[in-house]
């Protein structure tokens, strides 16, 4: 079960990475509908596949571009006269948003992101079945409870993904989508810990728990602020502001995110420093958290001083997610130590 949980966690990290690449490349609307892509199960690769062609056959739900508008076929039809068919209601303009652009790169980047998201459902269902069987067998239901929570968040994030597309990447919904993905990872950490806790506990210093809890809250807040900064960068990019001018063009509140990183660093160190001489598995956790924290600060400095390099954006996000998970994992051990 632990191996399957780790697989699910690794796949979720891949989805977070893919989602960050989608944002980095501006591919969020590469597929204008959900769950299909231009009404197709396999996305188009050429513009001719999404433009009206006389004499072509189209299935119901097929989406085409014409006159800078996205049109949806209302029935299966052999199309011969677009205007006549539009007048009779066989083609209807898509009304959930007005985004009508086809970019094959964006389409496939978004499709791969969705495909990875769908594949995460496989280990989620396997975990649900496995933990239920284990609960019946050994009367230990905590892993099953975590598996249910995990599946709930997975379904909710999938639904939010649809809402994000339908709303043409409504800004705050993207942040909520990211927090949902974070909740999926936290539920997996809880599941893994519920299996792990019967095989030994980690000795922790009681005085570090308070600082760790504060560090977790501040790091999540930084993650939310960072997502909002990223959305502002997207707006600047769409407005064709030069990359070198992005920092200067950001709203003043982004400095809260920039300066807040040093507060997060200080608070994280408050629980890490007393454990610097830890042994065993705790030593590994402390080293991992320290490495994630250092790399997170480094990529933040790169953003400010080197014009927000595109490659650093997904790395920065993954490091933040990893740091949050490390905090959650240690807090779970603190809780187990109390019970």
Residue ranges and their predicted role:
Residues 1-339:
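Polytopic transmembrane helical bundles with strong interfacial aromatic enrichment
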């Amino acid at each position: 079960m632990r191996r399957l949980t780790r697989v699910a966690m690794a796949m979720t990290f891949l989805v977070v990475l893919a989602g960050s690449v989608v944002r980095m490349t501006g591919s969020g609307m590469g597929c204008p509908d959900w769950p299909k892509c231009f009404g197709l199960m396999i996305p188009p690769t050429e513009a001719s596949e999404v433009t009206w062609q006389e004499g072509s056959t189209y299935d119901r739900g097929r989406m085409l571009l014409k006159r800078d508008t996205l049109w949806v076929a209302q029935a299966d039809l052999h199309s011969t006269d677009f205007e006549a068919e539009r007048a009779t209601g066989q083609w209807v303009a898509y009304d959930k948003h007005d985004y009508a652009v086809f970019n094959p790169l964006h389409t496939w980047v978004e499709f791969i992101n969705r495909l990875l998201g769908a594949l995460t459902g496989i280990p989620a269902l396997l975990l649900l079945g496995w933990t239920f069987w284990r609960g019946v067998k050994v009367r230990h239901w905590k892993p099953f409870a975590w598996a249910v929570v995990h599946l709930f968040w997975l379904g909710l994030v999938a639904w939010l993904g649809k809402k994000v597309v339908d709303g043409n990447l409504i800004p705050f919904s993207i942040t909520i989508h990211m927090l949902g993905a974070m909740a999926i990872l936290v539920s997996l950490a809880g599941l893994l810990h519920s299996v792990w806790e019967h095989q030994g506990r980690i000795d922790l210093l009681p005085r570090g728990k308070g600082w760790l809890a504060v560090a977790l809250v501040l790091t999540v807040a930084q993650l939310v602020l960072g997502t909002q900064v990223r959305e502002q960068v997207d707006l600047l990019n769409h407005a064709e502001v030069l990359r070198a001018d992005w920092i200067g063009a950001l709203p003043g509140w982004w400095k809260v995110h920039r300066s807040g990183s040093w507060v997060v660093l200080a608070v994280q160190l408050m629980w890490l420093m007393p454990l610097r001489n830890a042994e065993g598995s705790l030593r590994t956790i402390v080293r991992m958290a320290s490495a994630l924290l250092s790399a997170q600060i480094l990529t933040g400095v790169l953003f400010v001083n080197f014009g927000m390099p595109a490659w650093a954006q997904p790395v920065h996000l993954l490091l933040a997610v990893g740091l949050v998970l490390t905090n959650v994992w240690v807090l779970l051990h603190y809780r187990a130590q109390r019970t």
